[in-house]
UniProtKB/Swiss-Prot annotation:
Species annotation: Shewanella frigidimarina (strain NCIMB 400)
One GO cellular component term noted in the UniProt record for this chain: plasma membrane
PANTHER family in the cross-refs: CHROMOSOMAL REPLICATION INITIATOR PROTEIN DNAA
Gene: dnaA
Record-given protein name: Chromosomal replication initiator protein DnaA
Entry's localization field: Cytoplasm
Length: 461
């Protein structure tokens, strides 16, 4: 009875939560009765803590509404329920394709006999230096890391396919390799293939030229996990899309893991067939956003530590506050600072960094100003520049103004009072409220999250 009640609760949660929230946190849960207690099993500690913190009140309220004083007690645990299959709904897989001898790990079938046909060294494309342990986690990539970690522990499970999207240099490729390393660690016989989308196209063209298309199909449809970077490069390549469509279907039918990355949300990829874009969203889609200040500082400190350099905190904050677009830019700047320090023998101070990065810092300071942000946001939302300074409170004007204030706090070195002055003499508390409101909306609204990420890319390019 209580398990049936949980199924009804799932329906309520699916209605109330966004598709990403439901797929990320609710779908992986498994339920089973233990006496008068309903036990919800989470796949890992991260999911357990998140559900308990964010959704336990909603779940208990639903149980009370339905059963009053007879509502079951609720307990959380980590792992899989002892019996049968998960109660939570999952995409229904078609009949698995036939395989040769397989070694079972979790819910994924691993082919241990089929030999790579196109390139026997594909597994070596998984870079062993990219691990979850050296991936710096922050609010901007927290969901992406959690999903990737779950896939590495349970490939072919609830998050299949996993689609990661975001700008260049934000850590998507690092996560792909970390998943691959995790899968291979758990099962050394697993055939894990990582590649850029252009490599898939090149292999297909070569197969066509050599009259070996069937061999091509057998190889790609025999892998246990397929990770393809920058899927947007499939745009307008009709034959490649056709072949990948069938490969995608075959792998999912066999519950074999697929992870894809792109620089944009699946539905925004031009030149890719709708049937593919629809399939990209079958599992879980997660945005990887530019790192916030604290994460940028942590990245710099970790990189300096790995290089054997003592980086003062104030220097890390100085660099992080001025370079905001992506991880690659941060690491490149730090490498330049370290190289200059090694060549000159000078200590790494703020003045030294200002000198070593003077061209890079000058470019950043020139590009990102409050005025530039206001103009860019006004153009993006199709409102008048004067509205940024006006007292109008209609949502069509107030929301873009709040976005511009939040961007000004993140992308410039101006104080809250200075930002308020630039927006028509507003109080610093108004700016603080706007920043908090936009931070909240970025978690709750896909549209706001996308708008904010697009504006950061525009302003940082």
């Amino acid at each position: 009875m209580a398990v049936s009640l949980w199924q009804q609760c799932i329906g309520r949660l699916q209605d109330e939560l966004s598709a990403q929230q439901f797929s990320m946190w609710i779908r992986p849960l498994q339920a089973e009765m233990d006496g008068d207690t309903l036990v919800l099993y989470a796949p890992n500690r991260f999911v357990l803590d998140w559900v308990r913190d964010k959704y336990i009140n909603i779940i208990n309220q639903f149980f009370t509404e339905q059963m009053g004083s007879n509502a079951p007690k609720l307990r959380f645990d980590i792992g899989s329920r002892p019996s049968a299959r998960p109660v939570a709904p999952a995409p229904v897989a078609a009949k698995p394709v036939n395989r040769q001898t397989k070694a079972q790990v979790g819910t994924t079938s691993f082919n241990t006999q089929a030999e790579p046909i196109i390139n026997p060294n594909h597994r070596s494309n998984i870079n062993p230096t990219y691990q979850f342990d050296n991936f710096v986690e922050g609010k901007s990539n927290q969901l992406g890391k959690a999903a990737a970690l779950q896939v590495s522990e349970n490939p072919g499970g609830a998050y299949n396919p996993l689609f990661l999207y975001g700008g260049t240099g934000l850590g998507k490729t690092h996560l792909l390799h970390a998943v691959g390393n995790g899968i291979i660690k758990n099962n050394p016989n697993a055939k894990v293939v990582y590649m850029h989308s252009e490599r898939f196209v090149q292999d297909m063209v070569k197969a066509l030229q050599n009259n070996a298309i069937e061999e091509f199909k057998r190889y790609y449809r025999s892998v246990d996990a397929l990770f393809i970077d920058d899927i947007q490069f499939f745009a307008n390549k009709d034959r490649s899309q056709e072949e990948f469509f069938h490969t995608f279907n075959a792998l999912l039918e066999g519950n074999h893991q697929i992870i894809l990355t792109s620089d944009r949300y699946p539905k925004e990829i031009d030149g890719v067939e709708d049937r593919l874009k629809s399939r990209f969203g079958w599992g879980l889609t997660v945005a990887i956003e530019p790192p916030e200040l604290e994460t940028r500082v942590a990245i710099l400190m970790r990189k300096a530590q790995e290089s054997g350099i003592n980086l003062p905190d104030e220097v890390a904050f100085f660099i992080a506050k001025r370079l905001r677009s992506n991880v690659r830019e941060l690491e490149g700047a730090l490498n330049r600072v370290i190289a200059n320090a090694n060549f000159t023998g000078r200590p790494i101070t703020i003045d030294f960094v200002r000198e070593a990065l003077r061209d890079l810092l000058a470019l950043q300071e020139k590009l990102v100003t409050i005025d530039n942000i206001q103009k860019t946001v006004a153009e993006y939302y199709k409102i008048k520049m004067a509205d940024m300074l006006s007292k109008r409170r209609s949502r069509s004007v107030a929301r873009p103004r709040q976005v511009a204030m939040a961007l000004s706090k993140e992308l410039t070195n101006q104080s809250l009072p200075e930002i308020g002055d630039a927006f028509g003499g507003r109080d610093h508390t108004t700016v603080l409220h706007a920043c908090r409101k936009i931070a909240q909306l970025r978690e709750e609204s896909h549209d706001i999250k996308e708008d904010y990420a697009n504006l950061i890319r525009t302003l940082s390019s």
